[in-house]
Amino acid sequence: MEKKVEAILEFDKIKKQLTEFASSSLGEQAILELAPATDFQVVQKTQLETEEGAKIIRLRGSAPITGLTDVFAHLKRLEIGGDLNGLEIYQIGSNLRVSRQMKNFMNDLLEIGVEIPLLGALSDELLVLKEVEEDIAISVDESGKVLDTASEALSTIRRTLRRTEDRVREKLESYLRDRNASKMLSDAVITIRNDRYVIPVKQEYKGHYGGIVHDQSASGQTLFIEPQSVVDLNNERKALQAKEKQEIERILAEISASLAAWINEIHHNTFILGRFDFIFAKARFGKAMKAVTPHLSDAGVVHLIAARHPLLDAAKVVANDIYLGEDFTTIVITGPNTGGKTITLKTLGLLTLMAQSGLQIPAQEDSTIAVFEHVFADIGDEQSIEQSLSTFSSHMTNIVSILENVNQKSLILYDELGAGTDPQEGAALAIAILDASHAKGASVVATTHYPELKAYGYNRVHATNASVEFNVETLSPTYKLLIGVPGRSNAFDISRRLGLSENIITEARSLVDTESADLNDMISSLEEKRNLAETEYEEARELARGADSLLKDLQKEISNYYQQKDKLIEQASEKAATIVEKAEAEAEEIIHELRTMQLNGAAGIKEHELIDAKTRLGNAKPKTINKTIPQAPKQKPHVFQEGDNVRVLSLGQKGTLLNKISDKEWNVQIGIIKMKIKTADLEYIQPEKPKKQRIITSVHSSGSPAKSELDLRGERYEDALQKVDKYLDEALLAGYPQVAIIHGKGTGALRTGVTEYLKNHRMVKSIRFGAAAEGGNGVTIVEFK
């Protein structure tokens, strides 16, 4: 890709903005070296890297890249046997710390199932040198100072040095406290000259303290004297300082030697961390721009949805759909100047360079952009931020160069093609250049104000017209790109709006040739039809929104119905269970009495006792509420057989047929009791069949109403997040004020991931772990706004 094109399309300004998102000079350097790739697979890989980086930023907010430094020069010195200073050693240690933190960070993401294959493989290349990192951490601080903990010898030397310095200061302070001090000293302070402690003595008292004169004031009235009493202590202090320096040099040399054994590993770690910084910078830049990862085409197909120029004010820039490469390969944008035509060219060109550099683009999801081998641009910079003039000859020189180098994998952007010369000749040249560009197989977008080119899109099957919408009411362009509608002159309409006489306008119209007038009328008709279509489209969208609102209300009512139904069924079930429990208890009591009677001998059971027991069993049946229900069609009576499960109607109990006594009577086993029961008192019980899943017809496309809880136990991390996302939408549609998400306790990884996701969901008001009765920290309760 030519550097000239990058400059014309202002790609350098994108890179400058991108550097603000880098955390280190390594990331910044990678950005400065960034250039659009032309190999399709390379572009795919860099886009996937950025997408994985964006996924991590969405999940974690940031990555542990802070503290990364360019240490390649330090490693060069180690390579030739040199020693490093304390700050250089600290910087290498900082990189080792970042390497370890980054590797752990990436491993944590991989363990919870986040799919980041490219960045996961990149982190696998990082080598953790924990012992080397720890040795550096106890040896030097961030300013490069060697710490007392670097060696026992250094710690001892420094303790002795501090004590010696204290003794020197104590001795000198005694002179300052002397009652004659104010007379003999210029100032009651201890200072340093030639790295030795001294006091300021007046000239006339220089012999009073003895010792060594190290300096004097500019006037000569004050001498800085090291009294004789501290000369030995100062000498001792200097000797200790020399020992300290020697020990520090030994420590730095020792650490440097240990680092020299790991030069290649540290070099590779630093390179990998620089890549991470670069990738995360791209991801954060994309997030700041509200950009998306585009689909890539290797066949020259471009379909940008709501594409925005990234260097224009995001609050003011007009988003446009730009499509090319399927139904046509050439777009000719016609219409007056200052209408936003050049911005369209630059938007397409700049977004192409960004995509081929692995950057996300400012457009909507599902946008597609092509990967080109060459992007050529001949753009007059009248509307560029960097303004300059261009002559016809310089434009033509540029076009000649383009046509010599273009191929079928090229995108050409022509701005005001054929301008700067006689209009008739310029229009003819423009048409010929467009035909020549198409013959080379290139994708072309060109702007022109020549009316002759308005018919180009109709006369060439490979081309289409386009224009930038102009609002005659406000006398200003809307900057909205209209593909398929050529631009038209608005001179008459504008003149009328500004008050020009209708007679003059009528005469002017009569002077316009019929063909041009017909063309303008055709364009005007197209615009009217398009505006009508847009109006009808908006009305249809409004109706669709209304229908959607009604649908949501209906879904809410259905959800409320099922909730109420479930509640009533639950209440009824509880009541029925209580009744049955009571009936079972009474039946057990009766059976116990009968068993006792049986143990006492059959002869002991009186007839009236059996009748009484039978009556009590009948009374123990749960009372049912008679309802008037449609009578089911009478079925053919069942022919009873031994082993059939039956219900004894008079007792309300289930039993099993043992043997047939006669057509009118059977022996029936009811629990532990064998009884003779009349056939008319028996009801056949069908064997239970597997229950079929009840299908509920719903207006919601996803099936039955959402439940008030979602069970994620056993799910993989990313699958779980997708289910949570879908479930929250369904729960919101169902109108639930709050829901429960069951993730289990386990290692806590799934719980942590779900919690982080919920914190960032725009419709979530609050989250909390469940109470003990709700499932504790194995459940998250979500309250909606």
UniProtKB/Swiss-Prot annotation:
UniProt xrefs under NCBIfam families: mutS2
EC number: 3.1.-.-, 3.6.4.-
Self-association and partners: Homodimer. Binds to stalled ribosomes, contacting rRNA.
GO biological process: mismatch repair; negative regulation of DNA recombination; rescue of stalled ribosome
Pfam families: MSSS, MutS_V, Smr
Domain Smr: 710-785
Gene Ontology molecular function terms on file: ATP binding; ATP hydrolysis activity; ATP-dependent DNA damage sensor activity; endonuclease activity; mismatched DNA binding; ribosomal large subunit binding; rRNA binding
Protein origin, superkingdom: Bacteria
InterPro entries hit by this protein: DNA_mismatch_repair_MutS_C (IPR000432), DNA_mismatch_repair_MutS_core (IPR007696), DNA_mismatch_repair_MutS_sf (IPR036187), MSSS (IPR046893), MutS (IPR045076), MutS2 (IPR005747), P-loop_NTPase (IPR027417), Smr_dom (IPR002625)
Protein name per UniProt: Endonuclease MutS2
Alphabetical UniProt keywords: ATP-binding, DNA-binding, Endonuclease, Hydrolase, Nuclease, Nucleotide-binding, RNA-binding, rRNA-binding
Function: Endonuclease that is involved in the suppression of homologous recombination and thus may have a key role in the control of bacterial genetic diversity. Acts as a ribosome collision sensor, splitting the ribosome into its 2 subunits. Detects stalled/collided 70S ribosomes which it binds and splits by an ATP-hydrolysis driven conformational change. Acts upstream of the ribosome quality control system (RQC), a ribosome-associated complex that mediates the extraction of incompletely synthesized nascent chains from stalled ribosomes and their subsequent degradation. Probably generates substrates for RQC.
Organism, as annotated: Listeria monocytogenes serotype 4a (strain HCC23)
Similarity section: Belongs to the DNA mismatch repair MutS family. MutS2 subfamily.
Chain sites annotated for binding ATP: 335-342
